[in-house]
From Swiss-Prot:
Cystines in this chain: none
Gene behind this protein: mtlD
Name of the featured protein: Mannitol-1-phosphate 5-dehydrogenase
Organism: Erwinia tasmaniensis (strain DSM 17950 / CFBP 7177 / CIP 109463 / NCPPB 4357 / Et1/99)
Ranges in coiled-coil conformation: none
Record has NAD as a keyword: yes
Length: 382
């Protein structure tokens, strides 16, 4: 089995690429970072530091790499069995044109073996969005062939992979936590789904997408925003602060009540899942910077993301949301001179009031109780 993985960054190398290579898949990375590409091609191998109670170094072997904008991409997509991505939601549209050219070539070559594409991004139904970009770039005469032979498989992914230490001299070295979860929608594959240890199949993906978004992502973001306000540098420092921890746990319990109503999760099992995530935030071996985790606050405050979406769920089911409201308020107060969205957010707040800014970003109703509650919480935190 052959695979092409877009994104040779930390998540690509430390999570999805590693699972594919460990499964014996012949793996090629695609990226734009020439230093990483050169190192992968020179060595064909790289170390992954898996950190937890039993820290270990695992070696990934038998990989190579190509530049994302090269014609190699077209030839590879024409022949591989799987394409995966870990590039960031905003980059999917950029890689769609090369994918479309590869799919056209695959059709021209009469290669009727199934091709399955899986976007492994922090977003809801990311592969479905990628498919829309690919269809836009693909001449219409190929659309029917694509529908017959190419599967676009949505997934939910979860593994904390912080950036490499600044003093690391190895461009391929990556550190990951022990925990990982990759869940894919088995109903969307063309042909038989591949057997890849660490990739779980489900026919109820949205339950797992929202479980992860409403718990790991919600908790991670709120820990970062409250942590920054409290002067903490890392997620571990933030979660060890009793005041921060109480709000983070409370927010995950509020979003969890939505999940239990919506998907019928067992309350005791979900409570254990929340505790597992808090334990992951406490991991002393992960240096997870609050400024990094808090980046892109405009995206994180949008209607379909980790703060507003669970809050909308609490309104739908008439459930409490005090801690989620505090988390939204903390997000509005996030400041980072190195993040364009944080700068834009600060600019919006300098020109207009909190309620107008929140409504503009999130789509919430300006006259709603929840917007009034966020304004009150911002004033209390500021």
């Amino acid at each position: 089995m052959k695979a092409l993985h877009f994104g040779a960054g930390n998540i690509g190398r430390g999570f999805i690429g590693k699972l594919l290579a460990d499964a014996g898949v012949q793996l090629t990375f695609a990226d734009v970072n020439q230093a990483v590409l050169d190192a992968l091609n020179a060595r064909g191998t790289y170390p992954v530091h898996v950190v937890g109670e039993q820290a270990q170094i695992e070696i990934v072997n038998g990989v190579n790499a190509v530049h994302s904008s090269s014609d190699d991409i077209i030839a590879l997509i024409a022949e591989v069995d799987i394409v995966t991505t870990a590039v960031g939601p905003q980059i999917l549209e950029r890689i769609a044109a090369g994918m479309a050219q590869g799919i056209a070539k695959r059709s021209d070559n009469a290669n009727s073996r199934p091709l399955n594409i899986i976007a492994c991004e922090n977003m809801v139904r990311g592969t479905t969005q990628l498919k829309a970009h690919v269809l836009k770039a693909l001449p219409e005469r190929y659309h029917a062939w694509l529908e017959e032979h190419v599967g676009f498989v949505d997934s939910a992914v979860d593994r904390i992979v912080p950036p490499s230490a600044a003093d690391s001299s190895d461009p391929l070295e990556v550190t990951v936590e022990t925990f990982s979860e990759w869940i894919v929608d088995k109903t969307q594959f063309k042909g038989e789904p591949p057997t890849i240890p660490g990739m779980e199949l489900t026919d109820n993906l949205m339950a797992f997408v929202e479980r992860k978004l409403f718990t790991l992502n919600t908790g991670h973001a709120i820990a970062a925003y409250l942590g920054q306000l409290a002067g903490h540098k890392t997620i571990r420092e933030a979660i060890m602060d009793k005041k921060v921890r109480a709000i983070v746990q409370g927010a995950m319990e509020e979003s969890g009540a939505v999940l239990i109503k919506r998907y019928g999760f067992a309350a005791d099992k979900h409570a254990a899942y929340i505790q597992k995530i808090i334990n992951r935030f406490e991991n002393p071996y992960l240096i997870d910077d609050v400024e990094r985790v808090g980046r892109q606050p405009l995206r994180k405050l949008s209607a379909g993301d980790r703060l507003i979406k669970p809050t909308l769920g609490t309104l739908e089911y008439h459930l409490p949301n005090n801690n989620l409201v505090t988390g939204i308020a903390a997000a509005l107060l996030y400041r980072n001179e190195g993040d364009p969205q944080a700068i834009e957010l600060a600019g919006l707040l300098s020109r207009q009031d909190v309620a107008t800014t929140l409504v503009h970003i999130s789509g919430l109703d300006k006259d709603s109780d929840v917007v009034k509650a966020v304004v009150k919480a911002v004033n209390a935190l500021a």
